Swiss-Prot record:
Class I metallothioneins contain 2 metal-binding domains: four divalent ions are chelated within cluster A of the alpha domain and are coordinated via cysteinyl thiolate bridges to 11 cysteine ligands. Cluster B, the corresponding region within the beta domain, can ligate three divalent ions to 9 cysteines. A divalent metal cation 5 binds at residues 21, 23-24, 37. A divalent metal cation 4 binds at residues 20-21, 31, 35. Belongs to the metallothionein superfamily. Type 1 family. GO terms for molecular function: metal ion binding. A divalent metal cation 1 binds at residues 8, 11. It comes from Colinus virginianus. GO terms for cellular component: cytoplasm; nucleus. Keywords: Metal-binding, Metal-thiolate cluster. Metallothioneins have a high content of cysteine residues that bind various heavy metals. This is Metallothionein A. A divalent metal cation 6 binds at residues 24, 28, 31. SUPFAM superfamilies: Metallothionein.
């Protein structure tokens, strides 16, 4: 249940690894608790 839980624009979390959120809150613990913070593709 990460949907609606992410309210950040940049994710710098490298401790989570799954696939649920496109961003992760500060601390990468709320949304990351079972999901993953994917860093925005800087293209």
């Amino acid at each position: 249940s990460c949907a609606g839980s992410c309210k950040c624009k940049n994710c710098r979390c490298r401790s989570c690894r799954k696939s649920c959120c496109s961003c992760c809150p500060a601390g990468c613990n709320n949304c990351a608790k079972g999901c993953v913070c994917k860093e925005p593709a800087s293209s």
